[in-house]
Amino acid sequence: RVREICGDQRDLLLMDNNVMASKRFDDIIEDIIASGFGAGATYIEPNMLEIAIKNLKKETNDRGYIKKARTLLLDYYKSIKDKELSYKIYSALEENHLMRIETTTKQGIYNAYEVVKPYYDKKVKLRRPKRRSVDFNQGVDARLFTPHMAKQFARIAINPLRIAFDNMAIKDTYVSAIKMCQQEGLRKFSNYILYNFNDEPIDLYRRLKINVELCEELDIDIYSFPMKYHPLFDEHSHDRNYIGKQWNMKYVRSVQAVLNVTKGCIGRGLSFFYRAFGRTEKEFFDILLMPDAM
């Protein structure tokens, strides 16, 4: 029913990072596949204008679907390259007072749609399939991985698989989880790399280097996003300049300066990593201590 009213969606985003701890993990995977998000699944964008018109006729949220239909009609008009067709569609929109939201009416939408429909439908039929993706947005727990779970993840259109790597204490477990998934054919990974928490600055360097080296060793892609820790509660919850016990303001500023250059992301490529963070741990600290302005 949701698909009928709102149209099919390309991607599936799951916000619960405890899925692996669930006793019904296998059932969750089966539900994802049954919903059309199995490995290799594709998606063709539905005719959202047709859906908007149907919902208007059912009087389902008139205000919202009047706005939606008008936006789709205007977007279609702006995409037209043929001058004759462009003028025809513009005339239909103008005559029905759809060029301004203040003058747009339900009947005006209906009238313009009758003119636009055959051309719009033709464009929809030309749409090509796109790959679907499943994203466990909060990341899954490397400590819970088993070969069976890796095999199950490989059955769905997961892209990328986010595996948390919050500290060096889970290094071996994390590397094992990545290798299990790679053996099942998964090649796209991502994670947030927490820093400025209870970690030491060198831990950030080591975790990033591990990811880059895994990319080279296993021929996979891991995109790392260093994420500065900030307390949500207690006396530091409103302190935007919070500094962890093992960190200092200079170190934090230096890391942020490097991330500004890398656009916040570190992917595969040892040479790029070495230029950004140093070839050795000593070079990393040299970068952290480098003057802000050269």
PLM feature spans:
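Conserved SAM/AdoMet-binding glycine-rich loop
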Residues: 2-190, 195
